[in-house]
A protein has these predicted regions:
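Extended recognition/assembly regions associated with phosphoester-bond processing machinery
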Residues: 1-524
Length: 524
């Protein structure tokens, strides 16, 4: 084995075990490669570091020099070959080392020869200026109503909808349609009573006991502050009886597709800084992107990856949930981001990386969130292939439009809408898409900033709707839109355990942009 090959093997084993070499340590390994096996020294370093109570992510030169002396002494007293000795020493700590194959042929990434095609369609960063006054909130909901009303009136069956004021003046038994924002929802046995308002007036709408099961189902799925169209019959009592509920919806469409066979990796919720961060799995993921992990089929998938889209929660943050500090490997958020940057820097430079914040990141918690400050991502400032955008944002990659959203409001959907579950996040995402709004409910777990323009209204229908937050992998196709929740890289925390939720870890959806087919690549 040549010196460069021995050095590469040592570096791979370091990364797989979840550690990093600093510059001096790498230089030391390069120097000794001609006379010693660097992998043997790294094996001892991993064994020693794994036994320490105080964990560290970096291997320094002083440690390697000390361990080299042990290796030299050991070699004098044993006839075992260095490679064999290394395997015996390190396999218990690094079980995945044997799965990292050099492959039968050199990795030649197809995507490296393809020119990037990425355009930012929508990003709220730099456009946020609310003062949080009552007037701001009134303006915000008026804008939401107007934008969603416009989407509803694009439907043939809603174009002629009347204002609530006109509906109140209508004679009894008249059938008509109104557009309104739901301000109250009360359920009594088989009855649902809705309070609905537009910009001028308000009305009470009843979903009666004898309504069809389909209508009752639609009523159960309604959320507060959602803008919908209601087909009603005016009653003599002043109430209006619901005949149908119409969401803004998305029409059946043919999605855009790339003209070349390139792929996008969709991931999120890395949570560096957490003791539950799946470090080894994420290392395998980075190795895979570099063509250094997996079988030939996995490497073939990796060779076509041109984009990596990360939908928030890059770090675990500080003070996000009760007793979080007990599960932090570092309480310094700057260190958390530096560790995340170390990983992202190892993604090949021909791959374009898009990062948005989540509720654990160093950005304001209210939606929309501006991009993560450069002060935290300082190490990536010079990286020409890394784009730090706001949450949500829309990007076009090779002609395919992707709506990226961290997914905080999925908590509200799951907790308030019957039939929704953390185990099937794609169903909650589909409901948001049907509602044409990323966070309809105000006053729940999701904080909303009253901007003059409600950028959470889904005005452009994407080809791919990508979210995270829930830590559960799920995907489906709905009317030409690929809906994907990308799971995460954090094992079950005490907070998750409290709710009986088991996350999906280390499974990455990869979208072929030429066909929009989704392949899930496992790293756990």
């Amino acid at each position: 084995m040549s010196d460069p090959e021995k050095l590469r093997k040592a570096v791979e084993l370091t990364i797989t075990a979840g550690y990093q070499l600093n510059q001096e340590a790498f230089g030391f390994l390069t120097m000794i490669a001609a006379t010693e096996d660097p992998s043997e020294v790294i094996g001892k370093a991993i064994e020693k570091l794994n036994g320490l109570d105080e964990k560290t992510f970096f291997i320094n030169r002083n440690l390697l020099e000390e361990l080299l002396k042990e290796v030299e002494q050991s070699n004098k007293t044993t006839m075992k070959a260095p490679d064999t000795q290394f395997q015996e020493q390190t396999n218990p700590q690094t079980p995945m080392a044997s799965q990292i194959t050099e492959g039968k042929r050199q990795f030649q990434p197809y995507a490296k020869g393809i020119e990037k095609s990425i355009n930012i369609i929508e990003d709220s960063s730099g456009k946020l200026s609310s003062n949080g006054t009552i007037e701001d909130f009134l303006g915000y909901f008026r804008d939401r109503f107007k934008r969603t009303e416009k989407l509803l009136r694009q439907r043939i069956d809603v174009k002629s909808a009347a204002s609530i004021r006109d509906a109140l003046k209508a004679p009894a038994n008249m059938k008509l349609k109104i557009i309104g924002l739901i301000t109250e929802k009360r359920e009594k046995k088989q009855l649902t009573i809705l309070s609905v308002e537009d910009l001028e007036d308000h009305i009470t709408v009843l979903v009666p006991q004898n309504a069809s099961e389909d209508l009752h189902k639609k009523a159960r799925l309604l959320m507060l502050d959602q803008v919908v169209c209601l087909s009603v019959i005016k009653a003599r009592t002043g109430l209006s009886i619901a005949d149908d509920i119409i969401l803004p919806e998305v029409g059946q469409r043919t999605p855009h597709k790339a003209s070349e066979r390139v792929s996008a990796v969709l991931t999120s919720d890395i949570h560096t800084g957490s003791t539950k961060f799946q470090r080894e799995s994420f290392n395998r993921f980075i190795l895979w992107l570099n063509g250094k992990y997996g079988n030939e089929q996995m490497k073939e998938v990796a060779s076509h990856v041109k984009y990596v889209l990360i939908a928030g929660d890059i770090v675990d943050g500080v003070g996000i949930y009760p007793n979080q500090s007990k599960e932090l490997s570092t309480k310094d958020i700057y260190k958390q981001y530096r560790l995340a940057a170390k990983y992202i820097e190892q993604i090949p430079d021909y791959i374009e990386v898009v990062i948005i914040p989540g509720n654990h990141d160093a950005s304001r918690k209210a939606l929309p969130q501006p991009a993560i400050s450069g002060a935290y991502l300082e190490a990536l400032q010079e990286s020409k292939n890394v784009y730090s955008l706001g949450n949500p944002c829309s990007v076009s990659i090779h002609g395919v439009e992707v709506l990226m959203y961290h997914g905080r409001s999925l908590d509200d959907v799951v907790s308030t809408v019957p039939g929704m579950s953390n185990n099937n996040p794609e169903k909650a995402m589909r409901l948001l898409l049907q509602s044409r709004h990323l966070a309809p409910l105000y006053g729940g777990k999701t904080t909303l900033s009253p901007e003059s323009r409600d950028s959470l209204v889904i005005e452009r229908v994407p080809d791919i709707f990508h979210a995270g937050h829930i830590h559960a992998l799920g995907h489906c196709s709905y009317r030409g839109v690929s809906i994907i929740n990308s799971g995460g890289w954090q094992e079950q925390t005490e907070y998750m355990k409290k709710f009986g939720f088991m996350p999906t870890c280390g499974k990455v959806p990869v979208v072929d942009l030429q066909t929009l087919e989704v392949a899930v690549v496992p790293f756990s």
